[in-house]
Amino acid sequence: MKRLASALALMGSCVLATTVVSTPASALETYEAQMEASDAASQARVDMLEAFGPKVLKPGQYLWRDVPDSAGPERVVISLSDQMAYVYRGDTLMAATTISSGRDDKPTPSGIFSILEKMPMYRSKKYDNAPMPFAEFFEPHGIALHAGYVGTEPNSHGCVHLPTAFAKKLYGITEVGTPVIIGA
């Protein structure tokens, strides 16, 4: 957890430093960052068991519990191998859901990112004007967390599809700068 906090702090200083030269530093996609993200995804599985018990979610299902704002800032952890998203407030897991990430030919990037922009309803400029409700962009080339079809395997063009009700709740608690940690 300390290594993850250090990586997030480094990312924050990169964002601050690059703001001066107008180059968004939204991500750490280094090997080390990818390993940190994978560790965070592994820990999230353990935290889910402790927080919610031995629940098995079907595609489109989610769990959400109230956690006081005073617990700390939010962060999103994505496990690509499990096709799951986890939401923390501080060190407390508050939510978990099934997802659909990028297909093999359009993979979701792994590493440590932050939300760059939020749009309640966006339409894809790349994919036939496809709707992207509750879009939270974490990558400058249009990859986002958003409401979309959640099946049993990866099926997106790189985005992270979330169940609609979950995406709406997540959109309501995050802000630009919220960390998005994506591990294998």
Task: Locate predicted features.
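N-terminal pre-domains immediately preceding structured catalytic cores
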Residues: 2-134, 141-184
